[in-house]
């Protein structure tokens, strides 16, 4: 019977064997003594696998908002439904690992959600996010960010963020790191798409490479 995520106990199997084989008390004790090393090895392995899996489950981040929302709901179900089932079945160690790990992670992210008045830290399972006109996505910690888009919109993750003017366009970094990254350069491509370059460092030059005698202004325009 699986009591934990991976922890397998053979106690039930031993009890059924003793019952069906009509073993005496001495024979049953001898059987249990023989399987003690196997039981200990199984419990240690189950503990390690459970710990690794729960840690991965608590920190995993999906690529889209909807998938992150499903993962957030799965974590709540693990706390509210799965952990009590583990306790009821007697898997106290597994239940403790699940509750302690997930609760610690949720409380850590709840602090940033409360501080910045947004639930997206919990949904995205990240302590640092970049915001653009109310939309959020992961921030990799680099001093520059390049986003794709069009003449009046920017693609932030899977969201399309429209804007009227580029003059007030910037990325708000919030969470464990806090800063504003201004829009420094806009690159217009031949196919009509745009590249928006946000950076906390000033741009000192733009180098055109790989066009083989074709001038940059024939294919793209760069504006501040």
From Swiss-Prot:
InterPro entries in the record: a/bCoV_VIROPORIN_3A-like_CD, a/bCoV_VIROPORIN_3A-like_TM, Coronavirus_Orf3a/b
Domain of life of the source: Viruses
Domain CoV 3a-like viroporin CD: start-end pairs: 128-203
Signal sequence bounds: none
Subcellular location: Host membrane
CoV 3a-like viroporin TM domain residues: 34-124
Pfam families membership: Corona_NS3b
GO cellular component: host cell membrane; membrane
TM annotation in the entry: 40-60, 69-88, 95-111
Primary site of residence: host cell
Other facts: Bat coronavirus 512/2005 is highly similar to porcine epidemic diarrhea virus (PEDV).
Protein name, UniProt field: Non-structural protein 3
Taxonomic path: Viruses, Riboviria, Orthornavirae, Pisuviricota, Pisoniviricetes
